[in-house]
């Protein structure tokens, strides 16, 4: 399953939502330090400060931001260090 994240920006506040179904967390993507962090299952609230999508236990994949996205643009994010369409999920399968 691939997560399609809808990314929006309001001023310095960046938020996202996921089309993934069945996640225990509501946010799929978080922004910080020029990275996109995928972590529907949660992550480390201390070890990835500023780059976590949610606190709690689980896997977080940090993806360098290599493309500019327009407001409300869709990005297919995957854990292979890219923000281009791919068949992998960066959250919980």
Swiss-Prot record:
Superkingdom of the organism of origin: Eukaryota
InterPro entries: HssA/B-like_chaperone, HssA/B-related
Pfam families: Coiled
GO process annotations (BP): sorocarp development
Membership in a protein family: Belongs to the hssA/B family.
UniProt-recorded name of the protein: HssA/B-like protein 26
């Amino acid at each position: 399953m691939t997560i399609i994240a809808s990314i929006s920006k309001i001023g310095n506040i960046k938020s996202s939502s996921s089309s993934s179904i069945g996640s225990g967390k509501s946010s799929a993507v978080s922004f910080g330090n020029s990275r996109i962090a995928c972590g529907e299952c949660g992550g480390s609230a201390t070890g990835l400060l500023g780059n976590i999508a949610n606190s709690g236990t689980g896997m977080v994949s940090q993806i360098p931001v290599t493309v500019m996205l327009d407001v409300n643009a869709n990005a297919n994010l995957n854990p292979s260090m890219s923000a281009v369409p791919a068949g992998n999920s960066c959250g919980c399968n």
